[in-house]
Amino acid sequence: MLDVIELDFDYHDQPLLQQISFHLPAGGLLHLKGSNGAGKTTLLKLIAGLLNPEKGEILFERQSIKKDLCTYQKQLCFVGHRSGINPYLTIRENCLYDIHFSPGAVGITELCRLFSLEHLIDYPCGLLSSGQKRQVALLRLWMSKAKLWLLDEPLVALDELSLLTIITKIQEHRAKGGAVLLTSHQDLPLNKADYEEYHL
């Protein structure tokens, strides 16, 4: 599904990523690992088409993402580590915004029950805890029809039940032929044989 081929990227004229290459098949899960500042978030942004590499190529389903970037980006769901929710909007309003781009998604109240957020559905997201904000951001996974998920530190600030909910959703997505690329400082609660790791 996704091929990253000899990718280079410089930050302030200094090499940050060099000769990055890997293949992520349909049904695959790749865990990007590396210390702070190693370029994990930057690599996700490159794959999402938000940054341009100095060298190298990114292929999605054997075609360069540059060929039709807009169509490619409709095939991916990117959840960054800063959540990307509007703090002035309620949970409901943030979800309605996302559903606008993914019509046919399940009901918002039903989604909120996944993380026991239904009683907060009309609260401004700026009043939520960091863990609750993360949960709202991750609800996009249930609203998305994208084949490729790019998740930057999706497990941060989650309680044990929320963590299990996300891992279950990732596994369901893979079973349907989707692919997941994620960063995390913590080990994944999965059998090591069930996913690949790439160290930056």
UniProtKB/Swiss-Prot annotation:
Keyword flag Cell wall biogenesis/degradation: no
Protein purpose: Part of the ABC transporter complex CcmAB involved in the biogenesis of c-type cytochromes; once thought to export heme, this seems not to be the case, but its exact role is uncertain. Responsible for energy coupling to the transport system.
Main localization category: membrane
Protein's UniProt name: Cytochrome c biogenesis ATP-binding export protein CcmA
Sequence ranges assigned to domain ABC transporter in this UniProt record: 2-200
Origin species: Legionella pneumophila (strain Lens)
InterPro entries: AAA+_ATPase, ABC_transporter-like_ATP-bd, ABC_transptr_haem_export_CcmA, P-loop_NTPase
Compartments in which it is found: Cell inner membrane
Catalytic activity: heme b(in) + ATP + H2O = heme b(out) + ADP + phosphate + H(+)
